[in-house]
Amino acid sequence: PELRAELESRGTRLPWRGHSDTEVLLEAIEAFGLRGALSKCHGMFALGLWDAKRRQLSLVRDRLGIKPLLYVQGSFGIAFASELRALYELPSLRPRLSLSTLSSFLRFGVVPGTECIVEGVRKVPPGAILCFDEAEAPADKEYFWRADDVAAAGMRQPFEGDDREAVDELERRIRRAVELRMRSDVPFGAFLSGGIDSSTVVAMMQAVGSEPVETFCIGNTSSGYDESAHAAAVARHLGCAHHTLVADPADMLALVPEVARYWDEPFADSSQIPTYLVSRLTRQHVTVALSGDGGD
């Protein structure tokens, strides 16, 4: 809403056709240029922009690389997608396992950085703009945001308040971030495990919202892995509309073939199965959900 209002305040009558983020982003790029528009974007996004005047394709990924964006170059030209399986539809693409990426996966448990498990496919780096000209030359790469730059700026100008002021400032920023992400035309909720990360997000959602937050948790019949009691206690304290699904290890093991179909690449995190279950539970009630992933 802020970016749309800023564009309208410039005095130019804009031919809005709807209320989509994409339409606002295109008008922002036209008004401020690509880098200027990106500086005004918050949260996760990935985009491909064709500049008809310059005959140039730009691929852009959000600051932390939350949204996936893959690309491949070949005799067909350049293809890009948010899912690897979409690239498999290219008739001339013959997927082959990348042995170097497989080595990285076995070492780290994830496919790191810009690597891809399929040979020849690459990922746009987080916070980067890749530009391709009409001759399909190798991409020029520039960054509109780097974590190292932000950390260095923080070192040059450190926070000067005391501990209490630091806590208050952190709370203000988390609250603002949550508030921005609660602007939705569809029902939303949150994953709640009872840990610090998700509990903080839900507490902020409850503070800024007018209705009880719909929260979702997966329980486990194996007590050593069950956090549902903690989640339920947090939900009661905050006044949430809480939902719990209890699964046993046999149920989770049976899901392995199904879950594997949803991942484009190998993924060694055992939490993928409960995450799949809580996502499926959540989808029965709401369309969008916040989580505490990455909060620590």
Which functions belong to the PLM regions below?
Residues P266:
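A short, conserved beta-strand element in the Rossmann-like catalytic core
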Residues R63, L277-D296:
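Active-site adenylate/phosphate-handling loop in enzymes that bind or generate adenylated species
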Residues P1-W263, T275, S279:
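Cysteine-centered catalytic environments shared across enzyme families
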Residues Q272:
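Short phosphate-binding loop-to-helix
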Residues D269:
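Substrate-binding/specificity loop regions of serine endopeptidase catalytic domains
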